[in-house]
Amino acid sequence: MQADLSNIIALYGGSFDPLHYAHMEIIRLLRENLLYKRIILMPNYRNPLKSSSFFTPLQRLQMCKILADEMNNAKSCNQKIPYISVSDYEVCQNRSVFSVQSVAFIKEQITKQDTNAQLVFVLGEDSFNNLKQWKDVEKLCKMVDFVLIKREISQKDSQISPHIVPYAHVIKCLDLPPSVAHFSSSSVRSLLQKGQIDEALNLVPVCLHTFIKANFRL
């Protein structure tokens, strides 16, 4: 499926447990490409491939809203920069939701507003290479094209699995800069659990510091 680059809405989902600077950089890269009408952040209730989350679904949803507001309100000389919205669809289901279901819901919603709108799914390289483990992957790949986020850490990490290529169409690859490519939610969680709050917050956008301090408990 070929996407009309002038009419794309980018769906960026994830656990965001918690959000960190690499997530923020991905959003910035998406906005600066100016291919997208809008960027939708969608925190999940719980990753179907994981047992639990560190922050609650509602806390992660609120963090997404705080970051979206911060980035939307930032002054920019480019008035065409895409607006960031946050979807509570998966969180409101109060259960794990497979991506194929979420994509179908979002596609239905955006086409009600604009019949020409097209949806692309933003995925990290590791998630993309594990697509074969996802539910109804062939159906998902027929519904959307993909924007792939690559972490240029090693040659091995930069390889796209040949088993996925026949199923999925990647319309664009974006490279995370080395300065944040190694950032991960698991690193933030580990530091928080060790009581290294300041070190953890160094990996997290400043706009989220107050929220994390108020809601994190050892």
From Swiss-Prot:
Keywords: ATP-binding, NAD, Nucleotide-binding, Nucleotidyltransferase, Pyridine nucleotide biosynthesis, Transferase. GO terms for molecular function: ATP binding; nicotinate-nucleotide adenylyltransferase activity. The keyword Cell membrane does not apply. Pathway: Cofactor biosynthesis; NAD(+) biosynthesis; deamido-NAD(+) from nicotinate D-ribonucleotide: step 1/1. The keyword Phosphoprotein does not apply. InterPro entries: Cyt_trans-like, NadD/NMNAT, Rossmann-like_a/b/a_fold. Its EC number is 2.7.7.18. It catalyses: nicotinate beta-D-ribonucleotide + ATP + H(+) = deamido-NAD(+) + diphosphate. Catalyzes the reversible adenylation of nicotinate mononucleotide (NaMN) to nicotinic acid adenine dinucleotide (NaAD). Belongs to the NadD family. This is Probable nicotinate-nucleotide adenylyltransferase. It comes from Helicobacter hepaticus (strain ATCC 51449 / 3B1). The lineage of its organism: Bacteria, Pseudomonadati, Campylobacterota, Epsilonproteobacteria, Campylobacterales.
